[in-house]
Amino acid sequence: MSEVKRTQQGRVVSDKMDKSIVVAIERMVKHPIYGKFVKRTTKVHAHDENNECGLGDTVEIAECRPLSKTKSWTLVKVLEKAKI
């Protein structure tokens, strides 16, 4: 049986670490009482083997085995480079 890996898209908010990036994943959640859709942001640490990401890039990341205390995601591809 093949294992399906969870993937997410997000924006790189930090690339200061070696071979690591911090990705902010935004999602829309409906407020339970008022019904308004509100943005919620989750920040995850991801593994970037070749240090190819820059600040502001849009990336796709996939879940993987724990690589460190906080890293359980790995970079799949860079979808869009930031316009600087």
From Swiss-Prot:
Keywords: Ribonucleoprotein, Ribosomal protein, RNA-binding, rRNA-binding
The keyword Coiled coil is annotated on this UniProt entry: no
Superkingdom in the source lineage: Bacteria
Pfam families registered for this protein in UniProt: Ribosomal_S17
GO CC terms in record: cytosolic small ribosomal subunit
UniProt GO molecular function: rRNA binding; structural constituent of ribosome
Gene Ontology terms describing biological process: translation
Job of this protein: One of the primary rRNA binding proteins, it binds specifically to the 5'-end of 16S ribosomal RNA.
NCBIfam families with a match to the protein in the record: PRK05610.1, uS17_bact
Subunit structure as annotated in this protein's UniProt entry: Part of the 30S ribosomal subunit.
HAMAP family: Ribosomal_uS17_B
Family statement: Belongs to the universal ribosomal protein uS17 family.
Protein name: Small ribosomal subunit protein uS17
Species of origin: Vibrio campbellii (strain ATCC BAA-1116)
